[in-house]
Amino acid sequence: MIKTKKNRYEVYALGQHICMSPHKARRVIDQIRGRSYEETMMILELMPYRACYPILKLVYSAAANASHNMGFNERDLVISKAEVNQGTTVKKLKPRAQGRSYPIKRPTCSITIVLKNTSVNEEEFKRYQYTINQPGGLITKEKYTDMRCYDMYNNGGLWDKK
């Protein structure tokens, strides 16, 4: 099992054992990945696929988790990660003529929706640890550095000619 750090700006919802092929669910998930919450809700309500309803419920549940548990505003939420994995296959037998039976395989999938709060952009500020050698011993300090990327060619940089 891989342990990951919990991000305090992300909220997720997980749906398991959804009776649907993962290929059909991925067709819808690929359309909403990276979009805002409000835009995603409009897209899912208007798409004509059967896979939209369980995904709509998951996105709505993730947004409810974000607003209730973390206090995020729904206008600032963006779908940062959406993935569909294959679940277990439900196997049944269908009775046929003359005592025979045919197998029926119902595929299931698990869907994970991760919403990220964009009002606080954590990529702009990175935390660095550095050590200082002082007479009392080594001291470890944390420093927050602004890591925004400035385009020096278009914002009055060195070689900008007008």
Swiss-Prot record:
The entry's localization annotation reads:
Plastid, Chloroplast
List GO BP terms, alphabetically.
translation
The UniProt entry, under InterPro entries, shows:
Ribosomal_uL22, Ribosomal_uL22_bac/chlpt-type, Ribosomal_uL22_bac/org-type, Ribosomal_uL22_sf
Q: Which GO terms describe its cellular component?
A: chloroplast; large ribosomal subunit
List, alphabetically, the Gene3D superfamilies matched.
Answer: Ribosomal protein L22/L17
Molecular function per GO: rRNA binding; structural constituent of ribosome
Keyword Ribonucleoprotein assigned to the entry: answer is yes
Q: Which UniProt keywords apply?
A: Chloroplast, Plastid, Ribonucleoprotein, Ribosomal protein, RNA-binding, rRNA-binding
The UniProt entry, under CDD domains, shows:
Ribosomal_L22
Name the principal localization, coarsely classed: plastid
What quaternary structure, including any partners, is listed in this protein's UniProt entry?
Part of the 50S ribosomal subunit.
Q: Which family does it belong to?
A: Belongs to the universal ribosomal protein uL22 family.
Instruction: Name the HAMAP family for this protein.
Output: Ribosomal_uL22_B
Query: Which purpose does this protein serve, as stated in its record?
Result: This protein binds specifically to 23S rRNA. The globular domain of the protein is located near the polypeptide exit tunnel on the outside of the subunit, while an extended beta-hairpin is found that lines the wall of the exit tunnel in the center of the 70S ribosome.
* Protein name stated in the entry: Large ribosomal subunit protein uL22c
* Phylogenetic lineage: Eukaryota, Viridiplantae, Streptophyta, Embryophyta, Tracheophyta
Gene name on record? rpl22
